[in-house]
UniProtKB/Swiss-Prot annotation:
Compositionally biased spans, kind Pro residues: 60-81
UniProt GO molecular function: GTPase inhibitor activity; mRNA 3'-UTR AU-rich region binding; mRNA 3'-UTR binding; mRNA regulatory element binding translation repressor activity; ribosomal large subunit binding; ribosomal small subunit binding; ribosome binding; RNA binding
Oligomeric form and interacting partners: Interacts with TENT2/GLD2.
Protein family per UniProt: Belongs to the RRM CPEB family.
Protein name: Cytoplasmic polyadenylation element-binding protein 2
Bridged cysteine pairs (disulfide): none
Gene3D superfamilies documented for this protein: 3.30.70.330, Cytoplasmic polyadenylation element-binding protein, ZZ domain
Length: 589
């Protein structure tokens, strides 16, 4: 039979030369067509082609090494049919040891060849690293930054670039897919990775410890089950059929084909939307970069703590259901700004009635008795929270803001701003390790309604530091911001610095407002002086906000303590019904 062309297998990955190409390994001799399976290596110069001596009694003359653009001088004589070289087995223990030694030397020569060959293009594969995979649970940073092809990825030895700094490298010369330790039900069946795949002794194959599928294909997008495309007509998995077949070190066909298929997926239009189904798991489907293998990630994306813009940009904003009950995500009160000046209440109601029953309101509507919103904005009070989500779906987003076209008698299709309130923006915990101390909490009055709790926390932490919690006060019925907030500090120094300033400039985006800062007053605190002994066990009505006091007092103790020199000008604070501390003037008897 004619010899294979030197360029027949050179179309593979440029950083990993083909093992079946004789141009790369001129020291190899073809296998004898007879029963002996040894390798014949020339011994000229004492080196023996890098192996150190002969390996077989059959001395077959090696073919001359082919060169670029130089045809072979003459075809080899016809030989009898022979078995494939990659699957021949030694007939004696001595020949078996010789075969293993030849394979080890071949690997060493191939690796040294790879290190001296320049790469023709950028490679997305990982570097050959020295540290190994950890056996513990994966860190959050690694899960968060995982690659969408991680289930089908494998390390390749050689000088190749690392695909992600968050991935842990492989150890030694063992090349294996990443091994995830998960307790999810989908991983309960027997793993497709055998127990001895990480062996590195002389009796194990260190090139590739498991048989890789030679044809890695992406299932159709509209298929009902990804697992169906991996099963044969008999109902058995192709991976299961090849599970016991270890990879032959002298046969690189399957590895080449697999890597070619994976590299072709680099330019696949479904990149980032659909991952390769991993054998041994139950249909690991990843849509929009989210996989069922990582339920922690999906939970964090849907727990309501994501950015508001991201929630508004989602295709469907409908509430989730938990235990048969719908979970509300938005307040039923929605701000509408930029209304036409001649639009009245009925026209506003007609413009938004298609989303659900609602009532139109604006500040001081009852007192002013006006039929038009005086300042060009109003509030929509929907009966159902699902109406708010339907309104959000109908809006147009631009620069992180939502708009909807509204018409008046003189203006047609005027874009008005729709500003819903996400309930998750009412609270933000910056440092969960610190307990919330009401004695280290401040009240912030006049907070702009678009300001979220996370933004309030960032501003206060930048000014005073030590912020562990921030909250926006909302009304109990509609859960809409009331224009006030609370900030809890983890230390007394930050708390005193904040209340000593009295006023803070809130700057964020379009917001630039000077607000007042006071101590957060509680209405269920006992007197710090008498502990209720002098007031019949009643709660203390007064709180002294001066930094020299910062205590709750009953009426008797207040008069007693603040009659001293230097404290007669202290002014007590009391809590109003709307969670707002009010300053009063204490009258001396």
């Amino acid at each position: 039979m004619p010899p294979p062309s030197p360029d027949s297998e050179n179309g593979f990955y440029p950083g990993l030369p083909s093992s079946m190409n004789p141009a790369f390994f001129p020291s190899f001799s073809p296998v004898s067509p007879h029963g002996c399976t040894g390798l014949s290596v020339p011994t000229s110069g004492g080196g023996g082609g890098g192996f150190g001596g002969p390996f077989s009694a059959t001395a077959v003359p090696p073919p001359p090494p082919p060169a670029m653009n130089i045809p072979q001088q003459q075809p080899p004589p016809p030989a009898a049919p022979q078995q494939p070289q990659s699957r021949r087995s030694p007939v004696s223990p001595q020949l078996q040891q010789q075969h293993q030694a030849a394979a080890a030397a071949f690997l060493q020569q191939r690796n040294s060849y790879n290190h001296h060959q320049p790469l023709l293009k950028q490679s997305p594969w990982s570097n050959h690293q020295s540290s190994g995979w950890g056996t513990g649970s994966m860190s959050w940073g690694a899960m968060h930054g995982r690659d969408h092809r991680r289930t089908g990825n494998m390390g390749i030895p050689g000088t190749m670039n690392q695909i992600s700094p968050l991935k842990k490298p492989f150890s030694g010369n063992v090349i294996a897919p990443p091994k995830f330790t998960r307790s999810t039900p989908s991983l309960t069946p027997k793993s497709w990775i055998e127990d001895n795949v990480f062996r590195t002794d002389n009796n194990s194959n260190t090139l590739l410890p498991l048989q890789v599928r030679s044809s890695l294909q992406l299932p159709a997008w509209g298929s009902d089950s990804l697992q169906d495309s991996w099963c044969t007509a008999a109902g058995t998995s192709r991976i299961d059929q090849d599970r016991s077949r270890m990879y032959d070190s002298l046969n690189m066909h399957s590895l080449e084909n697999s890597l070619i298929d994976i590299m072709r997926a680099e330019h696949d239009p479904l990149k980032g939307r659909l991952s390769y189904p991993h054998p041994g798991t139950d249909n690991l489907l990843m849509l929009n970069g989210r996989s069922s293998l990582f339920p922690i990630d999906d939970g964090l994306l849907d727990d309501g703590h994501s950015d508001q813009v991201g929630v508004l940009n989602s295709p469907t904003c409908y509430s989730a259901h938990q235990n048969g009950e719908r979970i509300e995500r938005f307040s039923r009160k929605v701000f509408v700004g930029g209304l036409p000046p001649d639009i009245d209440e009925d026209e506003i109601t007609a413009s938004f009635r298609r989303f659900g029953p609602l009532v139109v309101d604006w500040p001081h509507k009852a007192e002013s008795k006006s039929y038009f919103p005086p300042k060009g904005y109003a509030f929509l009070l929907f009966q159902e929270e699902s109406s708010v989500q339907a309104l959000i779906d109908a809006c147009i987003e631009e620069d992180g803001k939502l708009y909807l076209c509204v018409s008046s008698p003189t203006i047609k299709d005027k874009p008005v701003q729709i500003r819903p309130w996400n309930l998750s923006d009412s609270d933000f915990v910056m440092d969960g390790s610190q307990p919330l101390d009401p004695r280290k909490t401040i009240f912030v009055g006049g907070v702009p309604r678009p300001l979220r709790a996370v933004e309030l926390a960032m501003i206060m932490d930048r000014l005073y530091g030590g912020v562990c919690y921030a909250g926006i006060d909302t009304d109990p019925e509609l859960k809409y911001p009331k224009g006030a907030g609370r900030v809890a500090f983890s230390n007394q120094q930050s708390y005193i610095a904040a209340i000593s300033a009295r006023f803070v400039q809130l700057q964020h985006g379009d917001i630039d407002k000077r607000v007042e800062v006071k101590p957060y007053v509680l209405d269920d605190q006992m007197c710090d002086e008498c502990q209720g002994a002098r007031c019949g066990g009643k709660f203390a009505p007064f709180f002294c906000a001066n930094v020299t006091c910062l205590q709750y007092y009953c009426e008797f103790c207040w008069a007693n303590i603040h009659s001293r020199a230097g404290r007669e000008f202290h002014k007590p604070l009391v809590k109003e019904g709307a969670d707002r501390p009010r300053q009063i003037h204490f009258r001396w008897n």
